[in-house]
Swiss-Prot record:
Free-text comment about domains: The N-terminal domain is essential for RNAP assembly and basal transcription, whereas the C-terminal domain is involved in interaction with transcriptional regulators and with upstream promoter elements.
Originating species: Borreliella burgdorferi (strain ATCC 35210 / DSM 4680 / CIP 102532 / B31) (Borrelia burgdorferi)
Lineage, broadest ranks: Bacteria, Pseudomonadati, Spirochaetota, Spirochaetia, Spirochaetales
Gene name as annotated: rpoA
Family: Belongs to the RNA polymerase alpha chain family.
Example of a GO cellular component annotation carried by this entry: DNA-directed RNA polymerase complex
SMART domains reported in the protein's UniProt record: RPOLD (SM00662)
Protein name per UniProt: DNA-directed RNA polymerase subunit alpha
């Protein structure tokens, strides 16, 4: 093969050394060598950009706060500009603190709602450690979220999702169906910082080869070692189609477009919904994925015997494929063309 013959004239990295790490794996220093001159910068910059932009993680995407005071009055916070009675910080500051919580769910979980209450009589400080419940693991437990007065009780509810990169509150609000729930901007990336440098290294008589030195800091949600493995896999997947360029260039777009259209005609039974949800949808003549996403939450909620749990189940299942109720066909095709596999 031409590619294999071409690579025979290149020096390919043979050594990958893991030089340093912290006990929790959140920091790692790696050296990779030897590279042909110039390839150290090319590979280092590529890995750095992928690490910072494309490693998936968890974030809190929505919250509901109710403040209960000793005079029996209560208030549900309706927006980020509302003040929370009995709390020193304003809501915007609290939201900023919440976005800094480093957490993850159990293996395979992509969405979870947690609810809990906290009383000023028991503690005057709400910390990230209070979020560690129901299978949620928190990595910066001492982070202060809010300061409470002695006579306040807070009822709290938070939505945690799995995702990638940055998602605005406007996008997250598409998945909210209850009033007085505040959608948050979400930063899913578990990577805090990446740096790299390129040094000279010797191979035989030549000393002008590149040695790539990379340092990775994570939030603890993923180890530095797993992060660099995942980044390398992402780069490989994006470049692999170019290896068989002639075979792929003429067929890939039409194939993905066709497969995406077929998925919209797929029976909703393949979404593995509960029998109750399937029966309710059948009564509304919703039988395909395309028909389902064309409905909005309000339409489904008005259907007979269609309860909150069924709606939440459907929203969660669609969300796992990056789809949502009320989505346009064009947007759905665009999403599905990038990931056309749905479990059979």
């Amino acid at each position: 093969m031409l590619v294999e013959k071409f690579l025979k004239d290149f020096t390919i990295p043979e050594k990958i050394e893991f030089l340093k790490s912290q006990g929790d794996g959140s920091y790692g220093k790696f050296t990779i060598y030897p590279f042909e001159r110039g390839f150290g910068i090319t590979i280092g910059n590529t890995l750095r950009r992928v690490l910072l932009s494309s490693i998936e993680g968890y974030a809190i995407t929505a919250m509901r706060v109710q403040s209960n005071n000793k005079d029996s009055s209560s208030k549900v916070v309706s927006s980020e500009f509302d003040l929370i009675p009995g709390v020193s910080e304003d809501t915007l500051e609290i939201i900023a603190n919440i976005k800094n919580i480093h957490l993850k769910l159990g293996e395979g979980e992509q969405r979870k709602t947690i609810s809990f209450s906290v009383s000023g009589k028991d503690t005057n400080v709400l910390k990230a450690s209070h979020f560690e419940r129901d299978g949620v693991e928190v990595f910066n437990k001492d982070l202060v979220i809010a300061t409470l007065s002695h006579d306040v009780n807070l009822d709290l509810e938070f939505q945690i999702n799995y995702g990638r990169g940055y998602v605005s509150s406007e996008q997250n609000s598409k998945y909210l169906e209850e009033v007085n729930v505040i959608a948050l901007d979400s930063i899913f990336s578990p990577i805090e910082k990446v740096s790299y440098s390129v040094e000279d290294t010797r191979v035989g008589q030549r000393s002008d080869y590149d040695k790539l030195v990379m340092e990775i800091w994570t939030t603890g949600v993923i180890s530095a070692k797993d992060a660099i493995k995942k980044a390398a896999s992402i780069v490989r997947e994006f470049l692999f189609p170019l290896v068989d360029f002639e075979d792929n260039v003429n067929t890939s777009f039409e194939k993905s477009k066709s497969e995406s259209s077929n998925l919209l005609d797929m029976s909703i039974e393949k979404l593995n919904l509960s029998v109750r949800s399937l029966n309710c949808l059948a009564k509304e003549n919703v039988r395909t994925l395309g028909e389902l996403i064309s409905k909005n939450a309000e339409e489904l909620s008005k259907a007979r015997n269609f309860g909150k749990k069924s709606l939440e189940e459907i929203i969660e299942k669609l969300g796992s494929y990056r789809l949502y109720l009320g989505m346009s066909k064009e947007d759905a095709l665009s999403v599905l063309s990038k990931n056309v596999k749905i479990s059979e």
